[in-house]
Amino acid sequence: MAQSIVEAPIRVDTSRKIIHVDMDAFYASIEEREHPAYKTQPLVIAHDPRQTGGRGVVTTANYVARQFGVHSAMPAAKALELCPTAVFKTPNFPLYREVSAQIHRIFHEYTEMIEPIAFDEAYLDVTTNKKHIHSAVELAHRLQQEIWHQTHLTCSTGISYNKFIAKLASDYRKPAGVTIVLPQDAEPFLLREPIEKFRGVGKKTVPKMHDLGIKTGQDLYAQSELDLIKQFGKLGYILYRRVRGSDDRPVEYLRERKSIGKERTFGPFLQSTTEVNTHLKAIAKLVAASMQSHQRHGKTLVLKLRYGDFVTITKRRTFGEFIPNDAALFEQYAEEIFEEVVDDHFNSGIRLLGITLTGLAPLAFENLTLPLYPNDN
C-alpha cells in the first residue's frame, strides 16, 4: 500500500517590520529636477546611440519615455527606435551617488538596520527604530515626506514582515505609493501574483513554469515541495516557502559585497569561439553596469566556464591597479583568459560562462582610473 507524504508546515515569522524603499525612476528624476524641461519630454538615461554607433544600454527612463515601451537594460538603439523624439542624457553617476548618500543619511535618522541594494533602493528593518514610531506605515510616510523635503524626489515603499513581500509591495503603487501587506493578507496577495514576480524566476525558468501549468502564485502553491525540488532544485525549495509567506533573510546592515558577477547557462551548448565571444561581450556589459550601479571597482577578474561534460574551470587574473568599469575591457580580459584555458573538453560544448570581479573597493575620487579610450567619456 502506497504511503502519502505529509509535508511539514512552514514556519513563518511575522514579528518584524520591514520597509523596502524604491526611488521612482531615480536617475531620470534627478535629471528632471536639475533640468525641469525634461519633465514633459521622453528622457532616456544612456549614451546617445547616434553618437556611439548604436552602442550602449538604457540605465533608466522617465515615465514619459516608458509610455513608448522604453525600459532599463534595453539597448539604447532600440529605445531610439521606439521613441525617436527621446532626449538621451549621459549618466551622471557622481551626482546620483551624492543624492543617494543624502537619502541614506535620512534612513539613518530612523534606523541603523539598512541594507542597500543599489543607489535607488534599500531594505530597512524598523521593528525597533530611533524615533520609537510603532506604526511602520506612519514611518514610511515620514520617510517619503523627508526625502521629498530634502531632495524633491519621490519614492515608493512596500511594508511587510519580510523582505520578499516588502519588495513585491513597493512596486504596487508607483510612483510615490505606500503599500502594506499584513500577515493575514500575505497569502491572498502572493497567490494572485504572476509567477514572473517571484525572485529567481527569470526568462529561462518562466517557459518551464508555464509548461507545468504554473503561471501564478496560486499555481505555485498547488505544487508539492518534492515536485518543485525535482523540477527546479534549490530554487524549488525556496519558492515553496516564499509562496507560503516565509522569508527569514535578515536585513544585512553590516553586509560588505565581496564580488560582483554574472553567469549565463546555455542550451544548446556553445560550440564555437565566435559564439563564446558573443556571449562574453553580453555578460561583460551586464557586469560593467552592475559594478557602476554598486559604485565599486575591482582588481581581479574571474572567468568561469563549464563544459557540456560538466568539467568546470575557474581562472582569475589580478592587476596591480583597479580595473576601469569598462565592458569592452572586461570582455577583452575574459576572451584572453578563455584562450589560455580552453582545452579538448570544448568538443563537448560549453554550458555555462561567467565573469566576476573581486577585490572590490568603493569608487572614490582618489582611486578613480581614467578611461583608456577617449570615447569612453
Swiss-Prot record:
Gene Ontology molecular functions: damaged DNA binding; DNA-directed DNA polymerase activity; magnesium ion binding
Enzyme class: transferase
Main localization (coarse): cytoplasm
Location within or outside the cell: Cytoplasm
Active site residues per record: E121
EC number annotated for this UniProt entry: 2.7.7.7
Pfam families hit by this protein: IMS (PF00817), IMS_C (PF11799)
Family: Belongs to the DNA polymerase type-Y family.
The name this protein goes by in its record: DNA polymerase IV
Species in which this protein is naturally found: Lactiplantibacillus plantarum (strain ATCC BAA-793 / NCIMB 8826 / WCFS1) (Lactobacillus plantarum)
Gene that this sequence comes from: dinB
